[in-house]
């Protein structure tokens, strides 16, 4: 990450202290002395920096004697580059540049402590920047549809870039399908685990067929994914948009192992679909002799 320190010769010692801190975290640091007042040099530095620190007597303003600093501050704030300002005068006054990306301090010590606390945030921001650039260079759009495509294709490296770039794990593709459902439909267990670790909604419902992730896994007859989602607390009582309970769907797939684990974790074999038929009724209709006693035991 690239840092720009804008300061005065009289504040050189304080600037060096902060520079040492930044370098210790593997940052690249440019230092510009306002005593030079070289607008061209400062402009080039602002183009390359990811963060900026101002160490001066006051905040940059039209009233001070350094017009290039006013330009730099305006440019950085306009580009939403985090701006950290240490001023020894007017410390109790409101900070005129205050925005979400601007931070004011009354001392170098305050700044140093805050930077130390914020470094995990800076590193995460740097990781996102790198990942987004990598996607851009590869010609990959940074959007949910593209993420869903790479989940389906099992492109692990690209999926990792989307996650590192800060994609919302609860986002949906153009059809309204949550990423977790996309992963379940394509038997991507590792991706399901990753998405849940990152906070994906385990019971998110798709807008196409109205299935939850565990319903998609049952539909695909993938026991490993069903077992994982069940153990993670997936809702087993949900009824799909077309009126199918989870266990009715499971009976339709004919996967006895899936039916058994669903019942063992509380799925109700008496819950009826839109036709008024329960999982037990379908088991009897289709002569699923191994499932009938399992379901009937739940009535007792």
Regions found by a protein language model. Give the residues of each.
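Ankyrin repeat domain, specifically the short helix-to-loop turn at the C-terminus of the second helix
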Residues: 163-168, 193-201, 227-235, 261-268, ...
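Conserved ankyrin/ankyrin-like repeat signature
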Residues: 158, 190-191, 224-225, 257-258, ...
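Ankyrin repeat A-helix N-terminal signature
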Residues: 149-154, 182-188, 216-222, 249-255, ...
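Conserved TIR/SEFIR loop-to-helix hotspot centered on a Trp-containing motif
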Residues: 59-78
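Ankyrin-repeat-protein effector appendages
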Residues: 128-146, 265, 274-275, 282-300
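C-terminal interaction surface of TIR/SEFIR-family domains
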Residues: 17, 93-160, 164
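Conserved N-terminal substructure of TIR/SEFIR domains
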Residues: 1-49
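Ankyrin-repeat boundary/"N-cap" motif
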Residues: 139-149, 172-179, 205-213, 239-245, ...
């Amino acid at each position: 990450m690239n840092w720009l320190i804008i300061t005065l010769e009289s504040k050189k010692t304080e600037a060096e202290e902060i520079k040492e801190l930044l370098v210790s975290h593997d940052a690249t640091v440019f230092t510009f002395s306002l005593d030079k007042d070289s607008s061209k040099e400062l402009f080039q530095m602002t183009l390359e920096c990811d963060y900026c620190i101002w160490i001066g007597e006051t905040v940059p303003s039209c009233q001070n004697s350094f017009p290039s600093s006013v330009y730099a501050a305006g440019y950085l704030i306009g580009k939403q580059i985090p701006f950290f300002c240490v001023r020894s005068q007017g410390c109790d006054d409101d900070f005129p540049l205050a925005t979400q990306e601007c931070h004011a301090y009354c001392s170098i010590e305050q700044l140093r402590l805050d930077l130390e606390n914020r470094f995990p945030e800076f590193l995460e921001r740097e990781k996102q920047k790198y990942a987004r650039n990598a996607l851009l260079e590869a010609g990959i759009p940074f959007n949910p549809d593209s993420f869903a495509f790479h989940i389906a294709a099992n492109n692990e490296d690209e999926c990792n870039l989307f996650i590192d770039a800060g994609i919302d794990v609860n986002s949906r593709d153009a059809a309204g399908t949550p990423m977790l459902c996309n992963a379940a439909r394509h038997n991507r267990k590792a991706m399901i685990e990753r998405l849940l670790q990152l906070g994906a909604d385990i019971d998110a419902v798709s807008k196409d067929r109205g299935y939850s992730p565990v319903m998609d896994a049952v539909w695909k007859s993938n026991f490993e994914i069903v077992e994982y989602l069940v153990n993670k607390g997936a809702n087993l009582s949900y009824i799909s948009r077309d009126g199918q309970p989870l266990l009715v769907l499971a009976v339709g797939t004919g996967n006895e192992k899936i039916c058994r684990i669903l019942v063992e974790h509380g799925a109700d074999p008496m819950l009826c679909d839109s036709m008024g038929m329960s999982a037990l009724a379908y088991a009897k209709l289709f002569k699923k002799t191994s499932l009938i006693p399992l379901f009937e035991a739940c009535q007792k």
